[in-house]
């Protein structure tokens, strides 16, 4: 029948749009994609507010097992796939849309606020941002060259760089602003390129889109010791 991919916004169960809520209530099956981001409320709170059981969909279910789960249900049921932020903010969701269309499943998209719009709370002008990059959980086996390359390219055009920090919600693991700065400093030292140093001006954010966000600016060395509170950062 149909697959509705519904953005939930960034904070809690009440950030869903009216249209999105109507679609959730009309759905036969409701999934929540739970690995690209996280809401700041519990699953049972969502279920109570929506009046529906919510199936937590991890990476395996959405990507490698979608044919057996989400898309299989959508062949003859109304399925809602809930996504924190905006539905089209990750390539994962674009992939499942393509696969659904290949199966002639009707697709409906309900947008919502995402980090790409909420970053405006920093006071930085959105049109002055360049390419975005992600910082993965750092280890000696995983060099983080891409973020530094993006920062370098954006500097040449005098553009800001939005860096998205890694997270692993099923295992309650979230990268902090402090860890991200440390990873960038270490990588830049390793490369000996000076792209990101202790004096680099940064803006660190946590819990954007909620009632108590933390936004702090300063040099990398200063922010590396600041407390940004609970995730997500």
Residue spans for each PLM region:
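A contiguous loop/helix-start segment that scaffolds small-molecule binding in enzyme catalytic cores
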Residues: 3, 78-79, 154-233
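Class I S-adenosyl-L-methionine
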Residues: 1-106
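A short acidic, often aromatic-flanked loop/helix-cap motif at beta-alpha or helix-coil junctions
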Residues: 60-66, 115, 170-171, 210-212
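Short, surface-exposed amphipathic charged segments that create phosphate/polyanion-binding patches used
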Residues: 68-75, 121-126, 144-150, 215-223
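Generic hydrophobic alpha-helical segments
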Residues: 20, 66-70, 147, 151, ...
């Amino acid at each position: 029948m149909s697959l509705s991919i519904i953005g939930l916004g960034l904070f809690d169960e009440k950030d869903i749009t009216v249209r999105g809520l109507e679609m959730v209530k009309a759905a036969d099956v409701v999934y929540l994609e739970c690995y690209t981001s996280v809401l700041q409320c519990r699953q049972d709170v969502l279920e109570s507010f929506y009046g529906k059981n919510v199936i937590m969909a991890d990476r395996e279910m959405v990507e490698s097992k979608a044919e057996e789960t989400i898309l299989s249900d959508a062949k003859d049921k109304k399925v809602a796939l809930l996504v924190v932020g905006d539905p089209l903010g990750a390539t994962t969701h674009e992939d499942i849309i393509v696969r659904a269309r290949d199966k002639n499943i009707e697709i409906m998209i309900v947008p919502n606020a995402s980090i790409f719009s909420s970053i405006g709370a920093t006071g930085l002008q959105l049109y002055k941002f360049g390419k975005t990059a992600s910082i993965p959980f750092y280890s000696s086996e995983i060099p983080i060259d891409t973020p530094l390359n993006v920062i370098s390219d954006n500097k040449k055009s005098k553009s800001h760089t939005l860096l998205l920090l890694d997270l692993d919600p099923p295992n309650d693991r979230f990268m902090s602003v402090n860890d991200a700065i440390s990873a960038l400093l270490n990588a830049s030292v390793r490369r000996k390129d000076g792209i990101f140093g202790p004096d680099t001006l940064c803006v660190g954010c946590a819990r954007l889109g909620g009632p108590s966000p933390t936004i702090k600016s300063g040099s990398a060395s200063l922010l590396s010791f600041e407390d940004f509170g609970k995730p997500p950062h």
